[in-house]
A protein has these predicted regions:
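Sec-dependent bacterial lipoprotein signal peptides
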Residues: 1-23
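Mature, structured domains of secreted/extracytosolic soluble proteins
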Residues: 23-334
């Protein structure tokens, strides 16, 4: 009897590896990614099936975005091909993207990497409240929620307050304008004439879709397993705040000096909780202008959840040149 029991145990032990191997093969087969599932965004761009993107891919790697495209994030990619990127590099005087300062590469490439996953339809008429709206509701302000959050931002800067204190100002990520035909339909204005007035070196090609800032779309909605890719005909240059644009032009210095007389550094609790420790400070600040539009802030609100404001609100400033101010002050006070 003892011998029979021992023999059974030996048989079980001999069969166990076969059973485990069979189970492992079955599990591997069960969890294997089906052939019909799309590749990740990095693989799609690397495949050559939709064009050559070697310079853009090199930039993504330099800027530290490769893992995101490989599946670490859900995103939308605005992808300039090699011809578009070489044109941009030539214009900037660079032989290769590796010749650019890393912070510039990060700022530029990050402007082509959007948070969240948007196909063509969602970018034509983005709805900040989600996709549960009725058809009638979707026609309300159609196309006017046109700005989308990117990974492009400037590093925090240390500024001096009027009292002489040093504060760290945090710069939020840039938003990218995407102009769809619905945007112009809702406003009741001609798309081509108005778009090309603001982008005189670009061509409106969005009659059935959209233009991405200064770029035309060559191919919409290339599918990846972690988002969508929209191929464009040129590199999209990061837009600056109105404040930065004015600051970089001497002829608006008087206007900016007057505007800055209302300037105040405001502590931001939410930003401080999220990011202050990473920069070795207790508090992060935003530079605002009292009751005037906060043209130095990248966002109209620091809450990333306020999609309605973030995707729609923008400012227009009528800024007289310094010579006009001099003439005004001369007439007014002499």
């Amino acid at each position: 009897m003892k011998n029979k029991v021992s023999l059974r145990r030996m048989l079980w032990l001999l069969c166990l590896p076969l059973l485990l191997t069979a189970c492992k093969d079955s599990m591997d087969e069960h969890y294997e990614v089906p052939d019909w599932v799309a590749d990740n965004a990095w693989e799609v761009l690397s495949s050559g099936e939709h064009g050559n993107y070697s310079i853009f891919l090199q930039g993504l790697e330099i800027a530290g975005y490769k893992q995101m495209l490989e599946g670490k994030a859900i995103l939308t990619i605005i992808a300039p091909d090699d011809d578009a990127f070489q044109t941009y590099l030539n214009k900037r005087g660079f032989t290769s993207i590796s010749d650019m300062p890393v912070n510039e590469v990060s700022k530029l490439i990050g402007y082509h990497v959007l948070y969240y996953s948007y196909n063509k339809e969602k970018l034509v008429n983005f709805r900040p409240t989600g996709s549960t709206e009725t058809e009638e509701e979707q026609n309300i302000k159609a196309g006017l929620y046109y700005k989308h959050r990117t990974r492009s931002s400037d590093a925090p800067t240390v500024e001096t307050t009027p009292t002489g204190a040093s504060v760290m100002v945090y710069h939020l990520e840039r938003y990218l304008p995407i102009f769809s035909y619905r945007y112009f339909q809702t406003k009741g204005i001609d798309a081509k004439n108005n778009y090309e007035a603001f982008y005189p070196n670009s061509t409106w090609t969005g009659d059935d879709g959209f233009n991405v800032s200064n770029a035309s779309v060559k191919e919409y909605g290339i599918i990846a397993n972690n988002g969508y890719i929209h191929a464009v005909d040129r590199v999209v240059e990061p837009l600056e705040t109105i404040y930065t644009e004015l600051k970089n032009k001497e002829k608006y210095s008087t206007f900016l000096d007057l505007y800055d007389s209302f300037g105040v550094y405001v502590a931001d609790d939410e930003l401080s909780k999220s990011y202050a420790k990473a920069y070795g400070v207790d508090t992060l600040y935003q530079y605002q202008h009292g009751g005037l539009p906060n043209i130095a802030c990248e966002w109209p609100t620091s809450s990333y959840l306020n999609f309605t404001a973030l995707t729609a609100l923008s400012y227009s400033i009528f800024a007289p040149e310094a010579a006009l101010f001099r003439g005004f002050f001369s007439r007014r006070f002499h």
